Amino acid sequence: MGTKTCISCGKARNTNKYSQNFKLKNGQPGFRNVCKDCDLLRKNKFISSTPYTYLTKVHTQSKSKRSKDMEWSITSEDLHDLWDEQGGRCALSGIFMTYGKDGNGSKEFNASIDRIDSSKPVYTRTNVQLVTYRVNIMKHTLTEDLLLWWCRNLIAKHDKID
């Protein structure tokens, strides 16, 4: 295994830290000029550059993760339209959503695709909304009414303690 210097970070690294993207005439592997770490940073920066690039990535990832039993008819353009219609705010909390991707896991305020009626196995334009990642985790399979009931009870209990 040889070493190669990344043109982005300037670090000399083992070639296993580079993506192979071609073969040389002698049959040996050819590697990209940018290491995998720098390439990932570049991709994440691009994905995080606008809400639309972020939502396009979310659409692609979400569609491929869903069960084959689920109907998926929304497009990335539908998500872009939802972002605009909602003014970049979470449909349930009204909080401004973020769209950052840095490779360090889920972000509390990032936009997330939520099925309005989780009992229906459909991702259609009329059954999805954009919410923050945290709100989507809290809602899970609950109806909106049941989620709000839980929230009111949590607040009532908290107010009694204060």
Give short role names for the model-derived ranges.
Residues 11-27, 98-119:
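Short recognition patches in nucleic-acid-associated and regulatory proteins
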Residues 1-92, 124, 137-138, 145-159:
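Contiguous alpha-helical segments
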